[in-house]
């Protein structure tokens, strides 16, 4: 049979699930432990545990926790962080590879945890504080606090707090009520069981019970009241612990926390309780136990006292005792020898033996109960003494002494006495005296030796004597003392004494001094035995001292020899000067020791002598004020203390008064970087000034300038723009510095100067200028036009809109420096400068004075310009233009033309003023020459015949060869020949002339025919007309000689000569005559002025003359006139005479004014020859003399003074000045012989090097890499350097190659030869 194929099916049986699923939450419900039993299926590889949140009847997949474990691991799984109060489905399946069994599952709800450590931390009558530890968990949302009164069910208080809070204060409670307080943990869907506490008391209990001051029948009980509760009272109950029937209680005020319990039983234990009472309720008691102390025995008594024993009695205390303890010890020094005895409670007495005789004992009795002791009962008792007392030395000599003592209260057989020298150098001596004696002598001792004497009282039987405690005394035998103590000298701090020496040998003397009043230190000194005199120092003034002198031996000293003395008054100390002012001083001093009644203060200086201050300072003062002193003067001040008739030594000091500061501090010429400071100098002799300038409101460098004493201004440069500066000016005198004159100045803003300035037009009195500016704020322009001489500058401030300006009011033919500034409020720019020269103005007022047939004499008014000459041209109609040669000098105002002029011809005259390369427009005039003259014969006075004289030609007139001219102002002065350099450092000699003075014509000498008499007028005058060219004519007497006319335009005849007819009478007319000599070709007339500085005048007349009229000499001047006849080359003196000139006369001549001079500067009039002083406008001091000249003319010059830096110095006066390089120079005024010059030499005490000043000191400077030492010698010696050392080298460099010698290159002594310079500007004024 064939079988069918089997049908096969594979069936896998399901895996069995685990069994015995068990869920175990932790006590705090924080974790869940899941456990199970293994699946019975084989091959299980592991288990999967799933915990899912169950919401309603469904699982919430979003809240699932899953864990897997292998078969080899324990079948336990722990889940944490489960939310309390939530229901979870926990399932477990068996896993075999990829197969899973059916799950086994259970549901569980995690309990909400309750608080476990809730407690009270503070309980008061109305509040309770709660504290707990917050639980951790994401579902805990907080805590609810519930308060329920005890016995009630409805809460009276409920509140919620956050999940992290662990503290809560329950307030608003009523005192005396019990409360149940619960705290419940809240979660999202539930809450925990409540944790409840109940307040057990109606009110809090007192604390800190203490017992102090416990005695046998009392004790002090203290406690601490409960906080934050107002109680009604405290109740204190106390009762013996063994007898509760004797309980007692006390009610205490609630404000008290202590009570004293009294009337207690000694040695008894008490139970003490303290209750806090609120209304009628009591708190839990605060209880303690304390035993009272034992009471002490009483009635202490002593009896049966001997030298070595006594008996003690007492009475028993109330408390029960177990015995007594008795302690005793000597009162003095016996605490360490304390003895102790104990007796039973039945005893009440005790005999103490073996005590020390004559000793006070302290006895203490204690009641004892077990270990407890009472306060001791204390008493004192002394044993009987057997020792002598009060041992003393009753008398002593150098070799013996007597002693005595008091006997003891016991029987004494005899006394044993010993004595020996201190130090143990001699053996002990001993003797006895009977027991009924209480004194004894000791002999055979050494003088001045110290002995120890001891006395013993001997008691007892003779075979066993008992010696008492000894009594001892020390004594020194006396030494022979000195005699005749005398006080020989007394000072304020010392006393000198002398004495006669001791008759016995001594080792020295001790001298002491003690204030008799007892107040003050004792001074003691020891001197050798051969000295019998001493000065005691260090004493107080005006104190009475007791002076003692002791003679000293080897073993001691004698009784003192005593004398008293009073020390003198002490002098003041510590003189100091405060508040030093210009004319006053305040002085202070330290008051002397001792008594002072008053002080005498004197002060002196060489100029004023000695003065005493009145009223004198009192004795309690220590200051004084001196007034009326000289500024900058050194004073010697003396202060003397006075007391009764005593006077101290003087306290002396010196002090220099202050110098006054400069005043009237002014600031000018303020620019952005500089300022000019000026001041008024003080009225004292100074050595210099110091100017300090420092910024006021911001940081910057400080400037300091040292100036000479003649300075009154300083220019400070290098300042910061628009900066406020504080300026201080100090006056210096040697080492003294005055208080500063101070001021505040602000530099200006930086303003841009004008640009592109130029001159567009120039006339005689105007200059037109133009300029440009930057585009910035401008408030105006300032223009200064300063002439070359510096006089009368023109200043103008104009509108900011102008860029062209015409400067008017200028002087013709003058060089000007024109400065243009840009203005901005108070600030101005630096100047731009233009040099300009005004045009030369033309001469004016042409006048023809004299005409002849071949010459014209004319004059003109000179222009205001300073000229260098004139050009004079002339022409006739149809003829060429000719020029007068030589050209007239700048001071000329007239000219005579006689070359090739044609008679009866009209000439045109051109006068052109010349200044260097500049020419003025011409002054033009026309004049006709005279026709040829006719020969006229006139009758001569006193002569019968007719004589014909021919006038001499002008061409034959000799000229003075040397002429000198003025400074260009049209006035010619003698002796001012310009600047001369004679090698002196100096100044300008300043000359002035005042008063109208007509241009002077040449002096004319006129020969006079016989028979003509000319009167003389003599007028004193210093004026010298010698600068002009004199012309000489013979006086031809014509019958019809026309009178002189003032009309200058009217022509005069040839006979009148070249006379100027408008002079005012200052020229003189003098006629002289002489005896004619044969063969004389001409006569030379020389006029020598007597007593003044005029230049001698010389004239010539023809040899046929025997007399001449001299015109043009100074009126009133004295001349020595010499007439010499010239024969070929030989001269023969014809006549010599001295005469005083007189004024010219004749009709039509104007006579001079009154001969006085009026000076408008001084406002005074002066007679002819009178002299006076005045100041020039430029600061020179002048010496003036009235000349008159008929016009009030006077002449001034500065030759009697030296002028320097605005100050004037007389001849011989010296002063200091600062040189151009800053060095100090010493100057001396030389005076008239040097024409106002002064000589300056290096200052005798100062040296200058590299801009620094040194005064008698040394400094170092570098030369060729070496350091040289320089020394200032001053004056002509200067300074020199030597001792040059090169650092690190041993060779000293030298300019001449010689090692160690003074460097010749560096031995500068700046021996500047005295430089003398003479500048003589002349200023002349011509009043209209």
Curated annotation (Swiss-Prot):
Disulfide bond positions: 1157-1186, 1184-1196, 1202-1229, 1227-1240, 1247-1272, 1270-1281
Glycosylation sites (chain numbering): 89
Occurrences of domain Fibronectin type-III (ranges): 1-14, 17-112, 114-202, 205-295, 296-386, 387-480, 481-572, 573-660, 661-754, 755-841, 842-933, 1054-1145
DNA-binding span(s): 1-13
Changes after translation: Forms covalent cross-links mediated by a transglutaminase, such as F13A or TGM2, between a glutamine and the epsilon-amino group of a lysine residue, forming homopolymers and heteropolymers (e.g. fibrinogen-fibronectin, collagen-fibronectin heteropolymers).
Organism field: Pleurodeles waltl
Residue span of region Heparin-binding 2: 658-929
Quaternary context: Dimers or multimers of alternatively spliced variants, connected by 2 disulfide bonds near the carboxyl ends.
Function: Fibronectins bind cell surfaces and various compounds including collagen, fibrin, heparin, DNA, and actin. Fibronectins are involved in cell adhesion, cell motility, opsonization, wound healing, and maintenance of cell shape. May be involved in osteoblast compaction.
Protein name in UniProt: Fibronectin
Region (Connecting strand 3 (CS-3) (V region)) location: 930-1064
Region of interest called Fibrin-binding 2, as start-end residue ranges on this chain: 1157-1288
Zinc is among the record's keywords: no
Keywords on record: Acute phase, Cell adhesion, Cell shape, Disulfide bond, Glycoprotein, Heparin-binding, Repeat
Any one Gene Ontology molecular-function term assigned to this protein's record: heparin binding
Motif mapping: Cell attachment site: 461-463
């Amino acid at each position: 049979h064939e079988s069918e194929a089997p049908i096969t099916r594979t069936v896998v049986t399901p895996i069995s699930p685990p069994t015995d699923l068990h869920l175990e939450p932790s006590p705090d419900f924080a974790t869940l432990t899941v456990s199970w039993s293994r699946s019975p299926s084989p091959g299980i590889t592991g288990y999967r545990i799933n915990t899912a949140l169950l919401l309603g009847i469904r699982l919430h997949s979003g809240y699932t926790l899953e864990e897997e474990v292998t078969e080899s691991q324990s079948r336990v799984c722990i889940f944490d962080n489960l939310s309390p109060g939530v229901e979870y489905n926990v399932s477990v399946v068996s896993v075999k590879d990829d197969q899973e069994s059916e799950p086994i599952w259970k549901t569980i709800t995690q309990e909400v945890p309750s608080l476990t450590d809730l407690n009270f931390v503070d309980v008061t009558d109305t509040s309770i504080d709660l504290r707990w530890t917050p639980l951790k968990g994401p579902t805990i949302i907080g805590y609810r606090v519930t308060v329920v009164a005890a016995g009630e069910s409805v809460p009276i208080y409920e509140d919620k707090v956050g999940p992290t809070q662990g503290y809560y204060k329950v307030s608003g409670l009523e005192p005396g009520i019990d409360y149940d307080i619960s705290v419940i943990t809240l979660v999202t869907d539930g809450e925990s069981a409540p944790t409840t506490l109940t307040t057990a008391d109606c009110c809090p209990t007192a604390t800190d019970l203490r017992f102090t001051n416990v005695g046998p029948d009392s004790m002090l009980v203290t406690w601490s009241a409960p906080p934050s509760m107002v109680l009604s009272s405290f109740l204190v109950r106390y009762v013996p612990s063994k007898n509760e029937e004797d309980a007692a209680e006390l009610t205490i005020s609630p404000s008290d926390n202590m009570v004293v319990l009294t009337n207690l039983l000694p040695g008894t234990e008490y139970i003490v309780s303290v209750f806090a009472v609120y209304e009628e309720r009591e708190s839990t008691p605060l209880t303690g136990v304390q035993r009272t102390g034992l009471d002490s025995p009483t009635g202490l008594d002593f009896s049966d006292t001997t030298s070595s024993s006594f008996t003690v009695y007492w009475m028993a205390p109330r408390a029960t005792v177990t015995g007594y303890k008795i302690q005793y010890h000597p009162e003095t020094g016996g605490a360490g020898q304390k003895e102790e005895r104990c007796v039973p409670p039945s005893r009440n007495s005790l005999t103490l033996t073996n005590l020390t005789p004559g000793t006070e004992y302290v006895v203490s009795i204690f009641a004892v109960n077990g270990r407890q002791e009472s306060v001791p009962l204390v008493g004192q008792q002394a044993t009987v003494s057997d020792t002598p007392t009060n041992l003393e030395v009753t008398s002593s000599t150098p070799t013996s002494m007597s002693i005595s003592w008091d006997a003891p209260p016991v029987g004494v057989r005899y006394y044993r006495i010993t004595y020996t020298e201190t130090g143990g150098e001699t053996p002990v001596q001993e003797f006895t005296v009977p027991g009924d004696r209480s004194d004894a002598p000791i002999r055979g001792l050494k003088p001045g030796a110290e002995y120890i004497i001891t006395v013993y009282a001997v008691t007892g039987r003779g075979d066993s004597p008992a010696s008492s405690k000894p009594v001892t005394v020390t004594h020194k035998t006396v030494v022979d003392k000195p005699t005749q103590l005398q006080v020989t000298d007394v000072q304020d701090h010392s006393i000198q004494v002398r004495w006669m020496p001791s008759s016995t040998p001594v080792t020295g003397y001790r001298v002491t001094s003690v204030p008799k009043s007892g107040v003050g230190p004792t001074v003691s000194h020891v001197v050798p035995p051969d000295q019998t005199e001493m000065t005691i120092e260090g004493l107080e003034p005006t104190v009475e001292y007791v002076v003692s002198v002791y003679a000293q031996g080897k073993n001691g000293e004698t009784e003192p020899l005593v004398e008293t003395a009073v020390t003198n008054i002490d002098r003041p100390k510590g003189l100091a000067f405060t508040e030093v002012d210009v004319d006053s001083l305040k002085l202070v001093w330290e008051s002397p020791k001792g008594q002072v009644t008053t002080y005498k203060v004197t002060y002196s200086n060489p100029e004023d002598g000695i003065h005493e201050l009145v009223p004198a300072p009192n004795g309690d003062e220590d200051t004084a004020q001196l007034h009326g002193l000289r500024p900058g003067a050194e004073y010697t001040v003396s202060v003397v203390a006075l007391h009764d008739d005593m006077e101290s030594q003087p306290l002396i000091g010196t002090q220099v008064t202050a110098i006054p500061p400069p005043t009237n501090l002014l600031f000018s010429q303020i620019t952005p970087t500089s300022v000019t400071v000026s001041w008024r100098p003080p009225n004292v002799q100074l050595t210099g000034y110091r100017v300090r300038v420092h910024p006021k409101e911001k940081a910057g460098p400080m400037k300091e300038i040292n100036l000479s004493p003649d300075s009154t201004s300083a220019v400070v440069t290098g300042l910061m723009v628009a900066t406020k500066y504080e300026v201080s000016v100090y006056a210096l005198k040697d080492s003294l510095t005055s208080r500063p004159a101070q001021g505040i100045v602000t530099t200006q803003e930086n303003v841009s100067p004008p640009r592109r300035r130029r001159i567009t037009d120039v006339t005689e009195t105007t200059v037109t200028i133009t300029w440009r500016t930057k585009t910035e704020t401008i408030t105006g322009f300032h223009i200064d036009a300063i002439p070359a001489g510096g006089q009368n500058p023109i200043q103008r401030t104009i509108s900011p809109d102008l860029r062209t300006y015409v400067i008017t009011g200028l002087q013709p033919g003058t060089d000007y420096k024109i400065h243009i500034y840009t203005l901005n409020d108070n600030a101005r720019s630096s100047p731009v400068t233009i040099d300009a020269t005004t045009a030369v103005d033309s001469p004016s007022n042409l006048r023809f004075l004299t005409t002849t047939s071949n010459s014209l004499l004319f004059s003109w008014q000179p222009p205001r310009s300073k000229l260098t000459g004139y050009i004079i041209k002339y022409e006739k109609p149809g003829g060429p233009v000719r020029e007068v040669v030589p050209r007239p000098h700048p001071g000329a105002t007239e000219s005579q033309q006689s070359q090739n002029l044609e008679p009866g011809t009209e000439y045109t005259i051109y006068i052109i003023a010349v200044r260097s390369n500049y020419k003025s427009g011409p002054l033009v005039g026309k004049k006709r020459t005279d026709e040829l003259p006719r020969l006229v014969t006139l009758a001569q006075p006193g002569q019968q015949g007719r004589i014909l004289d021919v006038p001499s030609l002008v061409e034959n007139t000799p000229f003075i060869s040397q002429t000198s001219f003025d400074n260009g102002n049209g006035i010619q002065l003698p002796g001012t020949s310009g600047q001369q350099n004679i090698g002196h450092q100096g100044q300008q000699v300043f000359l002035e002339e005042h008063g109208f003075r007509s241009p002077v014509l040449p002096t004319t000498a006129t020969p006079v025919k016989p028979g003509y008499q000319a009167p003389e007028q003599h007028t004193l005058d210093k004026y010298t007309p010698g600068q002009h060219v004199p012309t000489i004519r013979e006086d031809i007497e014509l019958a019809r000689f026309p009178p002189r006319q003032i009309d200058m335009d009217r022509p005069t005849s040839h006979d009148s000569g070249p006379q100027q007819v408008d002079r005012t009478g200052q020229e003189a007319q003098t006629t002289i005559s002489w005896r004619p000599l044969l063969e004389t070709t001409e006569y030379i007339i020389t006029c020598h002025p007597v007593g003044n500085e005029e230049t001698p005048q010389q004239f010539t007349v023809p040899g046929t003359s025997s007399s001449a009229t001299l015109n043009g000499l100074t009126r009133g001047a004295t001349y020595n006139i010499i007439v010499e006849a010239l024969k070929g080359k030989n001269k023969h003196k014809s006549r010599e005479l001295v005469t005083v000139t007189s004024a010219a006369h004749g009709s039509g001549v104007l006579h001079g004014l009154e001969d006085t001079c009026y000076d408008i500067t001084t406002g005074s009039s002066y007679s002819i020859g009178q002299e006076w002083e005045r100041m020039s406008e430029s600061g020179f001091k002048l010496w003036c003399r009235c000349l008159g000249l008929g016009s009030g003319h006077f002449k001034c010059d500065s030759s009697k003074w030296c002028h320097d830096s605005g100050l004037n110095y007389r001849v011989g006066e010296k002063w200091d000045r600062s040189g151009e390089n800053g060095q100090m120079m010493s100057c001396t005024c030389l005076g008239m012989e040097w024409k106002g010059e002064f000589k300056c030499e290096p200052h005798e005490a100062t040296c200058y090097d590299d801009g620094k000043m040194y005064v008698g000191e040394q400094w170092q400077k570098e030369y060729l890499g070496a350091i040289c030492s320089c020394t200032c010698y001053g004056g002509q010696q200067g300074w020199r350097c030597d001792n040059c050392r090169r650092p690190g080298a041993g060779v000293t460099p030298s300019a001449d190659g010689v090692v160690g010698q003074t460097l010749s290159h560096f031995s500068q002594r700046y021996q500047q030869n005295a430089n003398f310079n003479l500048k003589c500007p002349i200023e002349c004024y011509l009043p209209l």
